[in-house]
């Protein structure tokens, strides 16, 4: 099922929020999962991908 651009932006916003929560909780496993999802959603939207050097995602 394909998602609309608006739905993808909404998912990106929620994923960033989840990433920030995981970072505060110092949960590196969840941080990596959300960082990968953020980069995937950004690629889908055609915007610059965020870099996460502390997670080796550049």
Describe these PLM feature segments.
Residues 6-58:
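Short, charge-rich amphipathic interface segments used for partner binding and complex assembly
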């Amino acid at each position: 099922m394909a998602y609309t651009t608006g739905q993808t932006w909404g998912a990106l916003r929620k994923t960033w929020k989840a990433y920030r929560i995981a970072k505060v909780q110092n949960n590196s496993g969840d941080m990596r999962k959300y960082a990968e999802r953020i980069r995937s959603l950004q690629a889908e939207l055609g915007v610059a991908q965020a870099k996460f050097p502390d997670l080796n995602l550049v």
